[in-house]
C-alpha cells in the first residue's frame, strides 16, 4: 500500500474542525475524549495530516453542532 498524500480537502476539513472546535470552546483533548481518540490524532486531523473517516467526521460534526 502506498503512502497517503495530504490533499486540499483534508486541509480544509481540518481547518474547519479547528475553527469550530475553538468557537465551541473545546480543547483538542476534550474533543478527542468525546470521539475516543488522542489529542494527537485531533492535531493530525486539524493539520490535514490524517484523513478523517466519514463515521468519525459524523461524530465530530454532531459534537460541534453542524
Whereabouts are the PLM-identified features?
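Recognition helix of helix-turn-helix/homeodomain-like DNA-binding domains
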Residues: 35-52
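Short glycine/serine/threonine-biased micro-segments
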Residues: 12, 30, 46
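DNA major-groove recognition helix of helix-turn-helix/homeodomain DNA-binding modules
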Residues: 53-66
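Short basic helix-loop element that most often maps to the first helix and adjoining turn
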Residues: 15-30, 34, 59
Amino acid at each position: 500500500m502506498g503512502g497517503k498524500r495530504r490533499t486540499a480537502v483534508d486541509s480544509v476539513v481540518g481547518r474547519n474542525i479547528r475553527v469550530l472546535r475553538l468557537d465551541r470552546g473545546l480543547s483538542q483533548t476534550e474533543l478527542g475524549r468525546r470521539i475516543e481518540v488522542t489529542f494527537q490524532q485531533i492535531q493530525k486531523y486539524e493539520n490535514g495530516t490524517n484523513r478523517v473517516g466519514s463515521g468519525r467526521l459524523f461524530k465530530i460534526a454532531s459534537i460541534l453542532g453542524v
